[in-house]
């Protein structure tokens, strides 16, 4: 039982609180949840939204492994990262946290 609680505690620390999720992302997540509810067999059940830190800012990425898709990182206001910054972002980003995980992610 202790091991289970420890794992749960670690996972909890890696998931953001609802107050830390920007409104534009809450809307995206709501749409994904509706899609999954309408079709439980959709590949969306394997997806997730994650947050990284880079240069004292937060960036959000949508991961969809079955479709080999990953969105461009978006900042807190939902704007995509500048393409010119993408290589440095990929090398320097840190501190991944799950924002939302679909049921089978």
Predicted features and spans:
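C-terminal motif of bacterial Sec signal peptides marking the signal peptidase cleavage site
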Residues: 6-9
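A short, surface-exposed beta-strand/turn
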Residues: 68-84
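Exposed beta-strand-loop-beta-strand "reactive/processing" segments of non-cytosolic proteins
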Residues: 47-70
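Short, non-transmembrane alpha-helical segments in secretory-pathway proteins
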Residues: 15-43
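Bacterial signal peptide processing site
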Residues: 11-13
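C-terminal partner/receptor-binding element of secreted or periplasmic proteins
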Residues: 79-105
């Amino acid at each position: 039982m202790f091991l289970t609680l420890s794992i749960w505690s670690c996972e909890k620390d890696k998931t953001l609180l609802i107050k830390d999720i920007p409104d534009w992302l809450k809307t995206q997540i709501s749409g994904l949840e509706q899609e999954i509810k309408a079709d439980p067999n959709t590949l969306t059940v394997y997806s997730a939204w994650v947050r990284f830190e880079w240069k004292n800012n937060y960036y959000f990425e949508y991961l969809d492994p079955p479709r080999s898709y990953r969105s461009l990182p978006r900042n807190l206001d939902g704007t995509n990262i500048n393409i010119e910054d993408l290589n440095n972002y990929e090398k320097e980003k840190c501190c991944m946290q799950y924002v939302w995980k679909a049921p089978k992610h």
